[in-house]
Amino acid sequence: MSIKALILLDDASNGRLYLQAAQHLGLHPITLASDKAQCDMLAGEGMEAIRIDTDNLDGLIRECSRLSTTFDIVGITSALESVYATVGKLCRHFDLPGPNPESIERCCDKFVQRQLLAKAGVPIPAYRLAVNAAEVQSAAAEIGLPVVLKPAVGSGSSGVRLCRDVVELAEHTTYLLGGKHIWRSSPRMLVEEFAQGPYYSIDIMGDEFMGIASGEFGPPPHFIFQGTTYPAQLTSDECKRIADISLSCLRALDLEWGPKNIEFRWTNLGPIVVEVNPRLSGSPDPQLVKAAYGVDLITEHIKLVIGEEWDLRRKRSYVAAARKLVADCDGILDWIDGEASAAAVPGVAEVKLYVEPKAPIVRKGDYRDCIGHVIAASPSRATTEAVLKRAVDLIDWSITPFPSGDDAIAEFACAGLLG
């Protein structure tokens, strides 16, 4: 009997969780990735990884066909948004369960997504599309500052910035168009109204709602998550308003199959949709759901992918919270301590560091600025918050700034303290 294999395209923040969940389900995970370093790292961990251009659909079809002569390929998926439409095309070609690739492509283009949501009457921020600096300035003048300027395609808050005045607007426009931002296609930018208010996100599988989380960002102008709590403190009526709008989003975007994550801001006018993501949110959100409700969204997603019955029934009702550890300067990470002590605190569900000592730290103003996270969970919100604070306070690090332009060695270090 052939070994049952799950094909995974590229890697993401929760890619390792997909590999582990696949193995737990008795599957042999095979990663197809374009990054050689990623393949080498996975191979070093005993995982099967094949280097291939994941933007080449025909090449992927040939490789999957080759693998099917050895393995019983029971599913194809990815944790990465940029290749998720390709996943849908592969699933369609091999007659496997998967997302509608056309729906994914429409959703991943933030401008097209906005058009479809607006047509359906979904509350969204005012927006304009721009392809050059003049159009950015004109759009911002029409909408009114502050505005959010971001690439029309992308994820992880890469290239996303709050522009509070014309100087910040010009600076970020230059950044996006001046060669520093990597574009996968011709530059297209979204200029949109800054929807101000508490942040919430809802996780959905198919048409079933898993729950609503609240989130906190670090200081502007960037949108870097500092903390997430599951579930959010909302009334039943407030939850229903978010759920009803979410259903309208799914209908407008034809997103019936698989996992979704929808982001909101609760403004003076009520909940406004900031973004619809046609996939699971990245780490540590799946771990938060597992800590709060005992439901492994990644495992349930894989079950859906391979055509097995999936189950989102909650096994408990805890409050889970995560705190991101964010680098506060650029340089070389000298040391980071306290991981073991933090993990030993009763109520801590997970402590994860993304970097090791001597690693270079270069902040990008997005998810890549995070160097770790801590998750705590308990039946009580107050207890969870106290446990999380205690654990985070035990972790400390030091970053030595890079040498200055004259190559002088910096004589000081900036400490990473989270109070």
Please place each PLM-identified region on the residue numbering:
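Peripheral (often C-terminal) accessory segments that flank ATP-dependent C-N-forming ligase machineries
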Residues: 15, 134, 302-419
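Short beta-strand-to-turn element immediately C-terminal to the catalytic PLP-Schiff-base lysine
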Residues: 130, 160-165, 204-206, 267, ...
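Short, glycine/polar-rich helix-capping loops at beta-to-alpha or helix-loop-helix junctions
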Residues: 31-46, 53-55, 360-363
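Extreme N-terminal starter segment of soluble prokaryotic enzymes
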Residues: 2-6
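A short, Lys/Arg-enriched amphipathic alpha-helix followed by its capping loop at the start of a domain
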Residues: 18-27
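Active-site nucleotide/adenylate-binding loops and adjacent lid/helix of ATP-dependent enzymes
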Residues: 108-189, 196, 229-244, 248, ...
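Conserved N-proximal alpha/beta basic substrate-recognition cap immediately N-terminal to
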Residues: 43-131, 138, 370
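Phosphate-binding core of ATP-grasp and ATP-grasp-like enzymes
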Residues: 176-180, 185-188, 193-232, 240-273, ...
